[in-house]
A protein has these predicted regions:
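Internal gly/pro-rich beta-alpha loop/helix module
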Residues: 1-111
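Cysteine-nucleophile active-site neighborhood
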Residues: 179-262
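C-terminal and late-domain segments of enzyme folds
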Residues: 114, 127-137, 144, 243, ...
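NTP-binding/hydrolysis catalytic cores, primarily Walker-type P-loop NTPases
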Residues: 68-118, 315-353
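Short, solvent-exposed amphipathic alpha-helical segments in soluble enzyme
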Residues: 3-7, 34-37, 134-140, 190-191, ...
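Phosphate-binding active sites in nucleotide-utilizing proteins
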Residues: 111, 115-201
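Short acidic, glycine/serine/threonine-rich loops at helix termini
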Residues: 1, 28-33, 56-63, 132-134, ...
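Hydrophobic, well-ordered secondary-structure elements that form the walls
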Residues: 173, 209, 234, 275, ...
């Protein structure tokens, strides 16, 4: 029924075959395979057995850790498992028979090519939750993306030097999600935090999601050995984050922008998702949030007119933070507004030099 439903839902989609997963026994496989072959014309290309242990070590939300010293051994083991339980030649033949996807249009102007904007992004074992598509959207518009690490022994200056850049050449900063709680002690002691704070005070556009928001809050509270330890963060926003054992926000979010900011137009309605075991605490009673969530948890929930509403999003100068993750192709105003804010920042820096 599932295979028929997928095939018939959209006749324009070509379903070349299915691979069975989590198969408990040879009898289990035979029953499912015979049912598919009897009632559909879709070939079964393989059957992956149920495994005793998860082959990919994971933390919260089924995401693996970025730091995994055994990743090659793990990948080799998975490759062997797939090779032994699927018809690789039929899979390759089916894939090779598919039409080529059209190349996405490039929107790079001559001006952008001659002098690209440099947008840095934090990338290390603490911050690495990024959609590649978000990077692609920025690159399509001519942005040069520059990775920086908070956990590296190298200073930002040394890291930038490898790209023939200095701190003054950076036009924006993107801080994605990750596991900052696992490195809270190292982060709180990092000599690189003042540089981020300096960029923010200079009005640099900074866009932070989830873990990035935690970095920009005052403190991060994380349970260790049955008690909470508190770690000072950058403190851009007068708010703190606290971790719990169960998810505090998980799933899709529907957002309405209720206050002006450089990234999401006032009144715009868009979608994102939440992925966090922490929540915002100790916010000021008069704290103003940028978004009202029709669906989702956000940073806080308030009883208003007999309705329990959720709110998210903070802004300080050009520094933005929220729990909501975006998928840039579905929120087209994000990349364009981020770039326009970065371009204006570069212009102002040159005029004030």
């Amino acid at each position: 029924a599932l295979v028929l439903g997928i095939r018939n839902f959209d006749p324009e989609i070509r379903l070349a075959g299915v691979i069975l997963n989590n198969i408990a026994s040879a009898r289990h496989q035979t029953i499912i395979r015979q049912s598919i072959e009897e009632y559909t014309d879709i070939p079964v290309l393989g059957a992956i057995p149920r495994l005793k242990d998860n082959p990919i070590p994971e933390r919260h939300l089924c995401l693996s850790l970025n730091k995994n010293d055994d990743k090659q051994i793990m990948l080799d083991s998975l490759a062997e498992l797939i090779a032994d339980n699927t018809d690789i030649q039929k899979i390759l033949a089916a894939a090779g028979d598919m039409p080529r996807l059209p190349d996405p249009p490039l929107e790079i102007t001559r001006k952008m090519q001659s002098s690209p904007l440099n947008i840095a992004y934090l990338y290390d074992d603490a911050f690495w939750f990024y959609y590649q598509e978000n990077f692609d959207e920025l690159k399509k518009l001519g942005v040069n993306l520059v990775p920086l690490s908070l956990l590296s022994e190298q200073s930002f200056a040394e890291q930038l030097q490898a790209h023939k850049l200095t701190a003054k050449n950076i036009d924006g900063l993107y801080i994605g999600g990750g596991y900052p709680e696992l490195y809270a002690k190292e982060i709180s002691r990092s000599p690189k935090l003042p540089q981020i704070k300096e960029w923010i005070e200079q009005n640099m556009p900074v866009y932070a999601e989830c873990g990035g928001f935690m970095l920009l809050a005052k403190q991060l509270h994380f349970p260790e050995e049955k008690k909470y330890e508190s770690y000072p963060m950058i403190g851009v926003f007068d708010i703190e984050t606290k971790f719990f054992d169960k998810p505090q926000g998980l799933g899709y979010a529907e957002i309405k922008t209720i206050r002006e900011n450089p990234y999401h137009p006032l009144g715009s309605i868009w979608k994102g998702h939440e992925f966090h075991f922490s929540t915002a605490v100790n916010a000021k009673p008069d704290q103003e949030f940028l978004f009202e969530l029709k669906k989702g948890r956000g940073m806080t929930q308030k009883e208003m007119q007999n309705n329990n509403l959720a709110f998210d999003g903070l802004i300080y100068k050009n520094c933005f933070a929220s729990y909501t993750h975006i998928f840039a192709p579905a929120v087209p105003h994000f990349s364009k507004n981020f770039i326009e804010t970065a371009r204006q920042y570069r212009k102002n820096q040159k005029e004030n030099a």
